[in-house]
Amino acid sequence: MNGKLYALSTGPGAPDLITVRAARILGSLDILYAPAGRKGGDSLALSIVRDYLGEQTEVRCCHFPMSADGAEKEAVWNEVAAALTAEVEAGKQVGFITLGDAMLFSTWIFLLQRIGCPEWLEIVPGVTSFAAIAARAKMPLAIERQSLAVISCTAPEAEIAQALQQHDSLVLMKVYGRFARIKALLAQAGLLECALMMSEATLPGEQCWRHLHEVNDDRPLPYFSTILVNKQWEYAE
């Protein structure tokens, strides 16, 4: 059998939100690469997919540093991309799992840049965190002619402020460590009442805040925290 690499999206966190296709592929893999935020640490993505793995699957956890050291991250991306390619060339069925959707703000994208687009690569999409949040909070992402923007809160304040003015509905990702700044921008735009924040959507620790003005600026938030804004939606308590 020819080797193949699958980039498998795990969805937002609940194991039963994995796609049927991803679950089927997970059960057939020879090798699964699972990212971990720190050396020797647990992999959230692996905990999501573990029950779908076949007995034959060898799991390899790989550490992707969260530091600002560009050279360190480049070295890891190069190493993992080379390892994935070598396994495929050896005829293995290989998977790499990533939270949410593989093509949205994911570590996988940096590997894709190095691997390219060979015929032996398949990318399996998944439920995004903000799609899950919208469903859990019963808040539509966009209605009729509304524009929808997905913004990383790592962007400059001026760009975020401009997006808040230009778009009808927004997803503000990577809120962790930046909540006070984002809350202030929402207040300046008069949008606090149009926004909600959810952390760890679909996971056991899920939390939702519908009144952001009541959330202290220095409140500790989980890493997976996202804000949704819809200027034309009123939530019925």
UniProtKB/Swiss-Prot annotation:
Pathway(s) this gene product operates in, as recorded in its UniProt entry: Cofactor biosynthesis; adenosylcobalamin biosynthesis; cob(II)yrinate a,c-diamide from sirohydrochlorin (anaerobic route): step 2/10
EC category: transferase
GO terms of biological process kind: cobalamin biosynthetic process; methylation
Record-linked NCBIfam families: cobI_cbiL, PRK05576.1-4
Reactions catalysed: Co-precorrin-2 + S-adenosyl-L-methionine = Co-precorrin-3 + S-adenosyl-L-homocysteine + H(+)
Gene3D superfamilies attached to this UniProt entry: Cobalt-precorrin-4 Transmethylase, Domain 1, Methyltransferase, Cobalt-precorrin-4 Transmethylase, Domain 2
Assembly notes: Homodimer.
PANTHER family for the chain: COBALT-PRECORRIN-2 C(20)-METHYLTRANSFERASE
Signal sequence, start to end: none
Keywords: Cobalamin biosynthesis, Methyltransferase, S-adenosyl-L-methionine, Transferase
Name assigned to this protein: Cobalt-precorrin-2 C(20)-methyltransferase
The family this protein is said to belong to: Belongs to the precorrin methyltransferase family.
One Gene Ontology molecular-function label: cobalt-factor II C20-methyltransferase activity
Lineage: Bacteria, Pseudomonadati, Pseudomonadota, Gammaproteobacteria, Enterobacterales
Cross-referenced Pfam families: TP_methylase
InterPro entries reported for this sequence: 4pyrrol_Mease, 4pyrrol_Methylase_sf, 4pyrrole_Mease_sub1, 4pyrrole_Mease_sub2, CobI/CbiL, CobI/CbiL/CobIJ_dom, Uropor_MeTrfase_CS
Highest taxon listed in the record's lineage: Bacteria
Source species of the chain: Salmonella typhimurium (strain LT2 / SGSC1412 / ATCC 700720)
Keyword S-adenosyl-L-methionine tagged: yes
E.C. designation(s): 2.1.1.151
